[in-house]
Swiss-Prot record:
UniProt-reported outcome of changing G108H: 2/3-fold decrease in activity
Source organism: Saccharomyces cerevisiae (strain ATCC 204508 / S288c)
Pathway note: Purine metabolism; AMP biosynthesis via salvage pathway; AMP from adenine: step 1/1
UniProt keyword Repeat present: no
Family from the record: Belongs to the purine/pyrimidine phosphoribosyltransferase family.
Cofactors demanded by this protein: Mg(2+)
Protein function: Catalyzes a salvage reaction resulting in the formation of AMP, that is energically less costly than de novo synthesis.
GO molecular function ontology, one term from the record: AMP binding
Keywords: Cytoplasm, Glycosyltransferase, Magnesium, Metal-binding, Nucleus, Phosphoprotein, Purine salvage, Transferase
The protein, known as: Adenine phosphoribosyltransferase 1
Positions contributing to AMP binding: A133, T134, G135, G136, S137
GO biological process terms held by the UniProt record: adenine salvage; AMP salvage; purine ribonucleoside salvage
Reaction equation(s) it catalyzes: AMP + diphosphate = 5-phospho-alpha-D-ribose 1-diphosphate + adenine
Length: 187
């Protein structure tokens, strides 16, 4: 199967909720994909195929998943690729010494952490999450990968809200599996 055919089938499983969590947003819930093992496998296969095509000569060493929805498919993708999985968590959730990065949210700021010994310097890393909106949390994860002195190859997202221009904040190429939302909902 091609990436486009995987995406077409996966898109049919999404549930849409207009004006959630705020006015102008069409929330596309991708959780129904995980209720169907066949669709979940196709989600993983689509990302794996993309990464094999995008980086045929490069060994990927780690998948870094953002709390919390990056945890839903990041470990399974890492397993399918035969690489390690490393979580980026909210402050205070990881033991030991951690690097920290702040990001802005709608109502203030938040802090992400990654363990200092999680990834050896020079490792090749892919960051995954469910959606890119404003790009703040993904940019913070990218900053953490830089603090580890690893090579951030790409950000991978299931979906994207294009009109929020989040990818402009990111320091590496972006791949979005499912069709992006080009504009906000009309009021």
């Amino acid at each position: 199967m091609s990436i486009a055919s995987y995406a077409q089938e996966l898109k049919l499983a999404l549930h849409q909720y207009p004006n959630f969590p705020s006015e102008g947003i069409l929330f596309e819930d991708f959780l129904p994909i995980f209720r169907n093992p066949g669709l979940f496998q196709k989600l993983i296969d689509a990302f794996k195929l993309h990464l094999e095509e995008a980086f045929p000569e490069v060994k990927i060493d780690y998948i870094v998943g953002l709390e919390s929805r990056g945890f839903l498919f990041g470990p399974t993708l890492a397993l399918a690729l035969g690489v390690g999985f490393v979580p980026v968590r909210k402050a205070g959730k990881l033991p030991g010494e951690c690097f920290k990065a702040t990001y802005e949210k709608e109502y203030g700021s938040d802090l992400f952490e990654i363990q200092k010994n999680a990834i050896p310097a020079g490792s090749n890393v892919i960051i995954v999450d469910d959606i890119i909106a404003t790009g703040g949390s993904a940019a913070a994860a990218g900053e953490l990968v830089e603090q580890l002195e690893a090579n951030l190859l790409e950000y991978n997202f299931v979906m994207e809200l294009d009109f929020l221009k989040g990818r402009s904040k990111l320091n590496a190429p972006v791949f979005t599996l499912l069709n992006a939302q080009k504009e906000a909902l009309k009021k």
